[in-house]
Design a protein with these regions (language model features):
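C-terminal helical cap/extension that packs against the catalytic core
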Residues: 44-47, 54, 361-415, 450
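Short beta-strand "acidic-cap" motif of Rossmann-like dinucleotide-binding folds
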Residues: 31-35, 137-138, 160, 236, ...
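Phosphate-binding loop of NTP-binding sites
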Residues: 25-26, 47, 64-66, 75-219, ...
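Residue-level signal for inorganic ion chemistry
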Residues: 24, 71, 112, 141, ...
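Nucleotide phosphate-binding/pyrophosphate-handling subdomain across enzymes
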Residues: 2-7, 17-27, 135, 266-371
Length: 450
C-alpha cells in the first residue's frame, strides 16, 4: 500500500495516535493530527512527533474533515461521532489502526478475542512460543499498538495479537491465520444495540479464514460454539465435557489432540494459573501455540511458572486474616461471575463505576449465594443498589479509600474482600490499571496500619 502524499487525518494523540503519526510520516503521508485536549496538556506526545512535518489541530471538538484521503480514529474515539459519520457518507474511508496495520502485516498472524481472558491468553501464547524457540511479537489491544510492531516483524516468526470488538469493527481486512474466540458475555451494550450485535462483531475475527486456517472456539459458550461455520479448521475446547479432539478437561488434566497429532496431557496440578476460567484460557493458548509449532515439553515448563497478569483476580494481601483480591479488570458481569465462583468463602464485594448498559441482574443469583455484603461506589452505585436490593447488605461509599475501609470493617477472619467492579473505571480513574493500583496501595496502607 502506497501512502506517499496521501492526506490522512489521525484522531487522538495518545499512544496509538503517536504511533500512527510516526508510521504514516515515515511513509511520506501528509498527516494532520487532531485532539480535543489543549496543546499544553499534550506536551509529551507533541514532543514525540516533533520534526515529522505533522500538522496539529488541537483543542478542537469538531475538526475539518473534508478533503482527506483517509481518516484514522484512535481506539478510544466514539465511532458514532456525527462528523465521522458525515465523512463516511461522503466516501472518505474511516479505518482503525488495526485496519491500516493489516495492509502491512507480512508474518503469520495469531489473534485472540473474547469478552474476558484475552490478555492472559494472548500473553500466554507468546510465552509458549518463545519457550519453544520461536519468535513471536505480542501486541494489539494488550498495550503495544500493532502499527508499532511492524518495524520489527522481519525479526519475528509470528504476530500474536489481542483484538477487541472495537478493533474488529474498524478492521474489515484483518486476516489471522489462526484465531481463538474465548467467550461472549454481555459487555459494551452502551455501544452495541444487542448481545447478538456484539457477537456479530466478535465473529468478524473469522471473516477471511481459509480452509487450512484454524478457528479455536469455546464449546461451553453457546454463542461462541455456533461460530464454526464457513472455511477453516475448527478446534473446540471445553472445561465441562470430554471431546474426541481439540482440548478438554478430564481426570485432573488438560487433554489436547490436534488433527492427527498424538494426544498430549497437561496435569492441572502442574499449572500455576488457578480457576476454571484460567484453565479455559490455557486450553485456547495451548491450541494456538501447538498448532503454530510450539513444543509440548516447553509448554509444560511455561505453565508451571506463568502466574497470570495484574488486576485479574490478583491476591494483594491478608489483613487481620481477611484476604484482599484485586479484580479491577472485571469490568462486566461475566467477569464478576467468574471471580465470585472462584471463592468458597464469604465475599465482601466492592463494585461500581461507569455503566456500560450492563444487565446486572444476570449475576443476582451469585450475589445472593456468595456475597456477604456489597460495598458500592461510582456512578452506578444507585442503580446497583436497586438491582441487588435484598440480596445482601449494601453499603454505599464516596470513593475507593472508603470502600476498602468499610469492606475491612465488614469482613471477618477467613473471609474475602474482592474488588470486581462490573463496570468501567472512567468515572473515577484513568483506566482499570489505575483503579487496581489505587486499590492495592490502599490495601497495603491498611495492612501497615494494622
Amino acid at each position: 500500500m502506497d501512502l506517499k502524499d496521501k492526506k490522512i487525518l489521525v484522531i487522538g494523540l495518545a499512544r496509538t495516535g503517536v504511533a500512527l503519526c510516526r508510521f504514516l510520516a515515515e511513509r511520506g503521508a501528509r498527516v494532520t493530527v487532531t485532539d480535543m485536549a489543549s496543546p499544553a496538556s499534550l506536551a509529551e506526545p507533541r514532543r514525540q512527533i516533533a520534526g515529522l512535518g505533522i500538522t496539529e489541530e488541537l483543542g478542537i471538538a469538531r475538526p475539518r474533515w473534508q478533503g482527506y484521503d483517509l481518516i484514522i480514529p484512535s481506539p478510544g474515539v466514539p465511532p458514532e461521532l456525527v462528523w465521522l459519520n458525515r465523512a463516511r457518507e461522503s466516501g472518505i474511508p474511516v479505518w482503525g489502526e488495526l485496519e491500516l496495520a493489516s495492509h502491512f502485516i507480512e508474518k503469520p498472524l495469531l489473534a485472540v478475542s473474547g469478552t474476558n481472558g484475552k490478555t492472559t491468553t494472548t500473553t500466554l501464547v507468546g510465552e509458549l512460543l518463545k519457550a519453544s524457540g520461536l519468535r513471536p511479537l505480542v501486541g494489539g489491544n494488550i498495550g503495544t499498538p500493532v502499527i508499532s510492531l511492524l518495524a520489527r516483524q522481519h525479526q519475528a516468526d509470528f504476530l500474536v495479537l489481542e483484538v477487541s470488538s472495537f478493533q474488529l469493527d474498524t478492521a474489515p481486512s484483518l486476516h489471522p491465520q489462526a484465531a481463538a474466540l474465548l467467550n461472549i458475555t454481555p459487555d459494551h451494550l452502551d455501544r452495541y444495540p444487542s448481545l447478538a450485535a456484539y457477537a456479530a462483531s466478535k465473529a468478524g475475527l473469522f471473516r477471511h479464514m481459509r480452509e487450512n486456517e484454524l478457528k479455536v472456539l469455546n464449546a461451553g459458550d453457546k454463542l461462541v460454539a455456533t461460530l464454526g461455520g464457513g472455511p477453516g479448521r475448527v478446534s473446540f475446547f471445553s472445561s465441562n465435557r470430554p471431546l474426541t479432539r481439540g482440548a478438554w478437561l478430564a481426570d485432573e488434566s488438560i487433554h489436547l489432540k490436534l488433527d492427527d497429532a498424538k494426544e498430549e496431557l497437561f496435569p492441572v496440578a502442574d499449572i500455576r494459573l488457578s480457576g476454571c476460567h484460567n484453565l479455559e484460557n490455557v486450553m485456547a493458548a495451548l491450541t494456538l501455540a501447538l498448532d503454530a509449532g510450539a513444543v509440548p515439553e516447553a509448554c509444560r515448563r511455561v505453565l508451571a511458572s506463568f502466574q497470570g497478569l495484574p488486576h485479574r483476580l490478583e491476591f494483594v494481601a491478608e489483613v487481620d486474616r481477611v484476604a484482599f483480591y484485586d479484580d479491577s479488570k472485571g469490568t462486566n458481569v461475566g467477569a464478576v461471575a467468574v471471580s465470585l465462583a472462584y471463592f468458597s468463602k464469604p465475599v465482601i464485594l466492592i463494585a461500581g463505576g461507569r455503566d456500560k448498559d450492563s444487565d446486572f441482574s444476570l449475576i443476582s443469583p451469585l450475589i445472593r449465594e456468595r456475597v456477604k455484603a456489597l460495598v458500592l461506589l461510582g456512578e452506578t452505585q444507585e442503580r446497583l443498589s436497586q438491582v441487588w436490593k435484598g440480596l445482601a447488605p449494601i453499603c454505599q461509599v464516596k470513593d475507593l479509600a472508603e470502600a476498602v475501609r468499610r469492606a475491612h470493617d465488614l469482613a471477618r477472619p477467613g473471609e474475602v474482600v474482592l474488588l470486581s467492579p462490573a463496570c468501567a473505571s472512567f468515572d473515577m480513574f484513568k483506566d482499570y490499571v489505575h483503579r487496581g493500583e489505587t486499590f492495592q496501595r490502599l490495601v497495603k496502607e491498611l495492612q501497615h496500619a494494622n
